[in-house]
Curated annotation (Swiss-Prot):
GO MF, one example: 3'-5'-RNA exonuclease activity
Species per Swiss-Prot/TrEMBL record: Photobacterium profundum (strain SS9)
Protein name: Ribonuclease PH
TM annotation in the entry: none
EC number of the protein: 2.7.7.56
Summary of subunit composition and partner proteins: Homohexameric ring arranged as a trimer of dimers.
Gene that specifies this protein: rph
Protein family per UniProt: Belongs to the RNase PH family.
Binding site for phosphate: R86, G124, T125, R126
Amino acid sequence: MRPSGRSTSQVRPITITRNFTAHAEGSVLVEFGDTKVICTASVEENVPRWLKGKGQGWVTAEYGMLPRATHTRNRREASSGKQGGRTMEIQRLIARSLRAAVDLEALGEQMITVDCDVIQADGGTRTASITGAMVALVDAVNSMIEKGTLKKSPIKGMVAAVSVGIYKGEAICDLEYLEDSAAETDMNVVMTEEGKMIEIQGTAEGEAFSHEELLAMLALAKDGIADIVTMQKQALES
């Protein structure tokens, strides 16, 4: 039995609130249960130096957590003068995932930066960030079309993510903190709306997992992400 009473395949209640802030071209508050992340997409009419003159755009991301997003206060990374390894890993994952959804040549020499700020963490912050960031990215692109800086959308399709794992010997989907902290295996999966894999990050925290357990986790991820993509599209239509 899971702490929340959910079935093994059930994701947490998910809410995607668009236009959450006033100034960004795209902004979303995404909630996976008690995990809450603000995702803002900002457009710049330039690209990194190494892309200048190449006729393509760029999508990047930054990630951070408020000091009291967790049970105990974490020191702000800015106060130590550098980002931690976990932060850098997560923001690179978010950026790679978003770029898989975009035709960078069709974007032209423009850059979109998506900032993902965790205001409350209860497991799955990176997967929630990717899911919310994708919606914010679509809104930013639509804003560019309205302003005339893009003629058509470079979005190839939706991208979403979910965590899966082995908890008490059973494969489960969308782990909350109590499950994540006690899981034998923890895995994050990013997929396209067609069910193609973008990234799989999996680690056995205790006992090694079998090939059969891997397939079970991936099957849960595929079904969970399909449900999440449906929620993304519903949010964009609202």
